[in-house]
């Protein structure tokens, strides 16, 4: 039993059969708010469309036509509503003395065990006995007996005795409101488990491979670890000191390049590049004013000095005159 049918109300149209009127029950859901349904009215064993039953909240309608009145013995009729309805019921077969009869129950989402305010001076149309709590009704239809079996509290019964023709089938219709997609999805979500355990994510071998691994530089020719093409010499303090001494006396290589390279454990290219960079740094500092201007040298003298140093390195070194005189002095002594 779903809770959507807790708030339901009953319609009791009058069906004429002989001299006695009978009531048939229809169960309507209260989710529609104000709804009008057509029912039959008693007029000389014929059904007409003069009587209407309107179920809603505080809405009353009465039938403008009144037919002849059949007297019945007043019998107590009580029932308990399980909804929040303000129902006005008026039937033409009960005559002028049977006016609008208000069934007022307090509005609430689960307003159970609420007895209807039925005036004893108005005779009912047929003997009807309601017992128990009408919650989640299950309709069972027979030709002579209609029963409501409560789902949660006890088993209440609505017993109806029909009079007259036995072949007349009393309509006991249950108005089932088709749920909207929103309600249907909500019910499916309620029926489904609250949370499903998700399987842990699998780690494959291809996911472990890094797309951009760090590049491992090879050890260069001069001990520099980096890109193979980028050759950069890291000079030691001793090498830098000796190179600065040579540069202080002469900004260009005067001694044999191979001799300087051999004494510093460097090659000739490294020494040449260092002197070139050192001269560029010297000129930059002079332009910035950090160092005094060095005596200007002719522009071609630099190249001539470099060329002469290269030639001297290629030819065997001849003894200088000072060294020769010193040698002669030592031999004479």
Swiss-Prot record:
Glycan attachment residues as annotated in the record: 152
Family: Belongs to the Antp homeobox family. Labial subfamily.
Biased composition (Low complexity): 311-333
Alphabetized InterPro entries for the sequence: HD, Homeobox_CS, Homeodomain-like_sf, HXA1/B1/D1
Sequence motif: Antp-type hexapeptide, positions: 203-208
Subcellular location: Nucleus
Protein name, as recorded: Homeobox protein Hox-A1
């Amino acid at each position: 039993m779903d809770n959507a049918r807790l708030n339901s109300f009953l319609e009791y149209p009058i069906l004429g059969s002989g001299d006695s009127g009978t009531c048939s029950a229809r169960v309507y859901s209260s989710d529609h708010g104000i709804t009008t349904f057509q029912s039959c009215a008693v007029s000389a064993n014929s059904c007409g469309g003069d009587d209407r039953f309107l179920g809603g909240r505080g809405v009353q309608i009465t039938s403008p036509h009144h037919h002849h009145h059949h007297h019945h013995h007043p019998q107590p009729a009580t029932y308990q509503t399980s909804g929040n309805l303000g129902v006005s019921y008026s039937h033409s077969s009960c005559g002028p003395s049977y006016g609008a009869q208000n069934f007022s129950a307090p509005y609430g989402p689960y307003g159970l065990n609420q007895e209807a305010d039925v005036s004893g001076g108005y005779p009912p149309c047929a003997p009807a006995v309601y017992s128990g709590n009408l919650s989640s009704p299950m309709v069972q239809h027979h030709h002579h007996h209609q029963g409501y079996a409560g789902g949660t509290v006890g088993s209440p019964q609505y017993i109806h005795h029909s009079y007259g023709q036995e072949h007349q089938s009393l309509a006991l219709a249950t108005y089932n409101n088709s749920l909207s997609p929103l309600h249907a999805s909500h019910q499916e979500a309620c029926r489904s488990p609250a949370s499903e355990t998700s399987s842990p994510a699998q780690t494959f071998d291809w996911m472990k491979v890094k797309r951009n691994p760090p590049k491992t530089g090879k050890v260069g020719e001069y001990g520099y670890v980096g890109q193979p093409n980028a050759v950069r010499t890291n000079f030691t303090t001793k090498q830098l000191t000796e190179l600065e001494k040579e540069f202080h006396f002469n900004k260009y290589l005067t001694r044999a390049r191979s001799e300087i390279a051999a004494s510093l454990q460097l090659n000739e290219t490294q020494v040449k590049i260092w002197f070139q960079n050192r001269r560029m740094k010297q000129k930059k500092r002079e332009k910035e004013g950090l160092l005094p201007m060095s005596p200007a040298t002719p522009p071609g003298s630099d190249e001539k000095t470099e060329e002469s140093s290269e030639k001297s390195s290629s030819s065997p070194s001849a003894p200088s005159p000072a060294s020769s005189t010193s040698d002669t002095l030592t031999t004479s002594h």
